[in-house]
Amino acid sequence: MYKFESGILLIAYNNSKIDYAKIAAFASLAAKKSMANNHVTLMTDTFTLDYMKMSMSPELIASSFDHIIVEQLDHETNTRTHHDSPWVEFTTQFSNKNKHTIFEKSPYRKTLMIDVDYFIGNNTLDIMFDTDVPLAMYKRAVSVANYDPRIWEQKLHPDGIDMWWSTVVYWNADSEEAKLFFGIWEHVKENYDYYKWLYKFPGSLYRTDYAASIAVHLLNGQIKSNFIDQLPGHVMRYSDQIDDIVQFKGINDVTFLCPDPDKPWETICSRIKNENVHIMNKAAIIRHHDRLLEVLK
């Protein structure tokens, strides 16, 4: 039934402004350096794969991805505003509306799905593959400058339910819990406007974090319970879109320039070592392309 016992799944769909496939290659190589369960599958579309073959060497593609799932897709419109420091922003297509299909498409019995901008710097997530946990995610996050996320990244509404991050999702495909979760996620996605009204969250962007959080809430019986496990450490580290990358001394040794969210002209440097980090500023990752290739060899 499964092609492989366990591994890591990445999803990359390029658009006109962000080379997600290249970022995915960096994330994959980082995982391979840090984790024992490091068989990596890339889920992508024909447009992105064609661009990969033009912009990346065959050696880089082969060393990054052990398996590639390619589909011909017409992505639903989903426009997102990105930031590159507090002073630069741009909008572009964000193709994420089929993320719930990872349950059906993963070639693994036990899957760790990570977003392409999640860089693994240690092996703490390896422990999940040795457990009977059916499904796990992060609910809490702290920035590399030790700020809490904005309120809409802690809750769907100030008086509403907790937000769970869909940045990292682990599941065992044999479990009924995982099957139910992804089925409800799909239902929420198909009825997103209704759930947006019901849970009173703002914005026009389809957020997988919100869809997954509603699925968790429904599975929990619409109360706080422990139906969904939390990933090791219980806290996801992230760098904000307004943060910049100063230096990669190594894939597990990164220095960030972090503006104060309320006073962005005031900044600090934060050095993160041997941690897994969700690096939201994708333009900053691409700027360090050459250095990343050096440290990931």
Residue ranges of each PLM-predicted region?
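Short, acidic, metal-binding catalytic loop of nucleotide-sugar glycosyltransferases
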Residues: 30-37
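Short Gly/Pro-enriched turn/cap motifs at secondary-structure boundaries
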Residues: 91-92, 157-160
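Residues at the starts of beta-strands that form the adenosine-phosphate
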Residues: 39-40, 110
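Active-site-proximal specificity loops/subdomain of glycosyltransferases
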Residues: 49-106
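GT-A fold catalytic core of metal-dependent nucleotide-sugar glycosyltransferases
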Residues: 95-147
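Glycine-rich phosphate-binding "P-loop"
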Residues: 7-18, 79-86
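Short, polar loop motifs at secondary-structure junctions
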Residues: 44-49, 73-75, 119-123, 231
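A glycosyltransferase accessory/donor-loop signature
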Residues: 1-12, 20-26, 42, 50, ...
